[in-house]
Amino acid sequence: MTTEFMLVTLSNQSADARWGEKALLSTGAEGMTIHLTGKDKLGSIQRAARKIDGQGIKNVKLAGDGWDLENSWAFWQGFRGPKGKRSVEWAPLPAAESKELEQRLKIVDWVRDTINMSAEELGPEQLATRAVDLMCDIGCEAVSYRITKGEDLREQNYAGIHTVGRGSDRSPVLLALDFNPTGNPEAPVFACLVGKGITFDTGGYSLKQSAFMDSMKADMGGAATITGALALAAARGLKQRVKLYLCCADNMVSGNAFKLGDIIRYRNGKTVEVMNTDAEGRLVLADGLIDASAQNPQLIIDCATLTGAAKTAVGNDYHALFSFDDALAQELLASAAAEQEPFWRLPLAEFHRSQLPSNFAELNNVAGPAYTAGASTAAAFLSHFVTNYQQGWLHIDCSATYRKGAVDQWSAGATGLGVRALANLLLSKAR
């Protein structure tokens, strides 16, 4: 059976007036034309692709001039959706750009597909296994890994992951993956990447309302994003050793679930009083950050869908960036600009570290009632588990990972945003 493709072309001219003032799309005997008359050409292409998909067109051919790498990618970002199959016959590209497009399609689509999976399909161990499979597909000869789960976590003092995940019938998991393309098992670790992998978040006994719980299959978006970033950096030729830690668990309600007032004792000596079981992401990340710090890398990046406060500040349109290292923060913003991905820096100051008071432990897992900068205090909590937190550490609160509903540029579901910027940063720092 022959597949019929709709031809899609680009034009810098306005559409015929019959299509309406400032029309983005027009249709003719030869196919459809996207009219790029505004300043945001990539955004216009992405919005046009959403409109084309919305008309039920699933097979397209990008024809004519103008379909370079970034324009082609913008089209796919808008055209792709979580339901049904779509196919694109791409315009010819130079070999290097064609390879880059192929890598993005493979890796960023993996991120989007993984985040969109239902919690029934994707538990903590399945998330870890999918990450291993992706990295092995990119460069298996450079990959080794260890999966620690269930009671082994408790016995090895991964107190945060075990505490959060023990209330679920599905065992919590820590994936420690070593990407070492140097061939030298004693090579220094250049960077450590830590991801929050909460595969479903009920909020625990600090129970979420349904309207806030219905998207919590995507609470592992940080783990998927940082895994995708490492995979893309590796595919682009990363030559330095990087370790990846995914802290995976379900946050459920049960007779064995953790409770308000519990004290968690971490391997670095910190004690944490739990006063909100829905602030669980920082509790699992702490274990990964302790391991990351022990490697003494030049760079530590953690990614997490950590707070609603960050999303309130920047919406679903940006990832929120926190760091004490001004130069490093600017490097990430430069990488984000180079890849046309949206990051926005939010405040993180030394005084935020003292806004987590507890009567019974060194730290509270949420800020005191007088301190309302929720995203900043969450980042500050994490800093207590990074040995040299003032240099070489970035925290990404992944607000742009997932959309509950479709908008003019995106279908509902995962976006894959952040993968390219973080891969770019890894490569630029590794040079």
From Swiss-Prot:
Answer yes or no on keyword Cytoplasm.
yes
Q: What class of enzyme is it?
A: hydrolase
Necessary cofactors: Mn(2+)
Superkingdom of the source species: Bacteria
Amino-acid positions noted as binding Mn(2+) 1 in the UniProt annotation, renumbered to this chain: 201, 278, 280
What residues sit in the active site? Answer: 208, 282
Swiss-Prot/TrEMBL catalytic activity: Release of an N-terminal amino acid, Xaa, from a peptide or arylamide. Xaa is preferably Glu or Asp but may be other amino acids, including Leu, Met, His, Cys and Gln
EC number, UniProt record: 3.4.11.23
What is the cofactor note? Binds 2 manganese ions per subunit.
| Keyword annotations | Aminopeptidase, Cytoplasm, Hydrolase, Manganese, Metal-binding, Protease
Write down any Gene Ontology CC term: cytoplasm
Q: Where does Mn(2+) 2 bind?
A: 196, 201, 219, 280
Give an example GO biological process.
Answer: proteolysis
Chief location of this protein?
cytoplasm
The molecular function GO annotations come to: manganese ion binding; metalloaminopeptidase activity
Cellular compartment(s): Cytoplasm
Q: What does this protein do?
A: Probably plays an important role in intracellular peptide degradation.
Q: Which family does it belong to?
A: Belongs to the peptidase M17 family.
What binding partners and quaternary form does the record give? Answer: Homohexamer.
Q: What is this protein called?
A: Peptidase B
Q: Which organism is it from?
A: Serratia proteamaculans (strain 568)
Q: Gene name?
A: pepB
